[in-house]
């Protein structure tokens, strides 16, 4: 677990470094002076001011004590600044490029990682994962498994000595591929036949059970399912697969964020409904939200240790997904993030008004408070998952 946490910390640091480097390079290319490039948040651990570097003159490069973050400090960062070399003095389009350069770098990093993985083995985690017919091929590293999670008392399953932990091999001579397929075969047997044939594996031994089942009857089992571990391999189409997979998971991430926000808002509103049924439904929605979100503690303490056990390819795949998540998060219109800063800047431009330093500080402070509150809640939920 410790190794997984260390790997996760390194990956997160590198992804944030890449994001901030995007901002810094874009600033330099658009005539904005970069004063500081830092990994982590203060207090300062080590640092050095370099007279001449690829980010400009007299840039201070720092590593700070608080990890999981980073920043670029530019000259005249407030929109109202107007001296030569100030961020505020740059044109609207120059600021737009600077603000979204970090997002672009995160997407580029994800696409590059996924392209390399498409050559050496890209973990396939969804059935419709992007691939190119005629080139991409799927290899099953570890077959899936459907097993009996529980047996209902006095049910057909119990009467025929089907036990919790039994692995389902075949139902009616058809190979078991998923829990959904088993449910369908059981229903077909109860509707069209008077018996069901089940082949199970118990303690390494295969056993066949033939049980009578009447029309509409249930077998009386709950199933647990472990998905097959599959890898996708491509040759000439690897760059296409890398970009396509990046776009696919970007879309899924946006959809996921929308669903979470929708459930959060409706869940909170429904909590005040007079109907007990609606309030219970609200509790379920909020519980789903709590299970769907993961912060740094969850990523480092749960996800990376599990991914580490599955090898380098899964770690790289997870790094790509986190890079996509960083890009999506920074596009969102939250004032303290890149997308929020751009939205505020755009609103003031459309209104033809100057965004004063005081107004910008107040808006950013509100955004930061919202972010810190969300992070506090997510961190608490992460710790509950570690138990």
Question: Predicted segments — roles?
Answer:
Residues 149, 157-180, 246:
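Conserved PDZ fold ligand-binding element
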Residues 95-110, 116, 314-331, 337:
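Pore domain of cation channels
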Residues 3-83, 322-324, 329-351:
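Small-residue-rich helix-interface/hinge motifs
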Residues 163, 169-170, 181-224:
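PDZ-domain C-terminal substructure recognizer with occasional recognition of PDZ-binding tails
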Residues 7, 11, 29, 59-62, ...:
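Internal alpha-helical transmembrane segments
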Residues 138-142, 155-167, 188-191:
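A short glycine-leucine-enriched loop at secondary-structure breakpoints
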Residues 377-387:
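Juxtamembrane boundary at the C-terminal end of a transmembrane helix
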Residues 90, 141, 214-326, 346-362:
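Functional transmembrane alpha-helices
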